[in-house]
From Swiss-Prot:
A motif (Nuclear export signal) lies at residues 12-21, 85-94. This is Nuclear export protein. Interacts with protein M1. May interact with host nucleoporin RAB/HRB and exportin XPO1/CRM1. One of its GO terms (biological process) is exit of virus from host cell nucleus through nuclear pore. InterPro entries: Flu_NS2. SUPFAM superfamilies: Nonstructural protein ns2, Nep, M1-binding domain. One of its GO terms (cellular component) is virion component. It is found in: Virion; Host nucleus. It holds the Pfam family Flu_NS2. Belongs to the influenza viruses NEP family. Mediates the nuclear export of encapsidated genomic RNAs (ribonucleoproteins, RNPs). Acts as an adapter between viral RNPs complexes and the nuclear export machinery of the cell. Possesses no intrinsic RNA-binding activity, but includes a C-terminal M1-binding domain. This domain is believed to allow recognition of RNPs bound to the protein M1. Its main location: virion.
């Protein structure tokens, strides 16, 4: 993962953690946790691709990796829908910018995970 993506993740997570969205702050914390989890998962897939010999250990260590991959795509789709929903419902420009950048980052992460997974299949 390049340094721009790392700083984008860190910047978005920091800004999202500073948002006060009233009763939905628990939902926002959940989104932040899921975004961090997806980042780690994407990083681990990228590392496995870099060490193609890891493919066999990845498959033998975790026979359900395709199921996990499917679950991660479901999480990404849910997060994308949640971010779009929040983007439509906020009038605060700080929140709009943050959610637009989070949406762009989620789409990039989805594409990277898809690319890595095709290389591993």
């Amino acid at each position: 993962m390049d340094s721009n993506t790392v700083s984008s993740f860190q910047d978005i997570l920091m800004r999202m953690s500073k948002m006060q969205l009233g009763s939905s702050s628990e939902d926002l914390n959940g989104m932040i946790t899921q975004l961090e989890s997806l980042k780690l998962y994407r990083d681990s897939l990228g590392e496995a691709v870099m060490r193609m010999g890891d493919l066999h250990s990845l498959q033998s260590r975790n026979e359900k990796w395709r199921e996990q991959l499917s679950q991660k795509f479901e999480e990404i789709r849910w997060l994308i829908e949640e971010v779009r929903h929040r983007l439509k419902n906020t009038e605060n420009s700080f929140e709009q910018i943050t959610f637009m950048q989070a949406l762009q980052l989620l789409l990039e992460v989805e594409q990277e995970i898809r690319t890595f997974s095709f290389q591993l299949i």
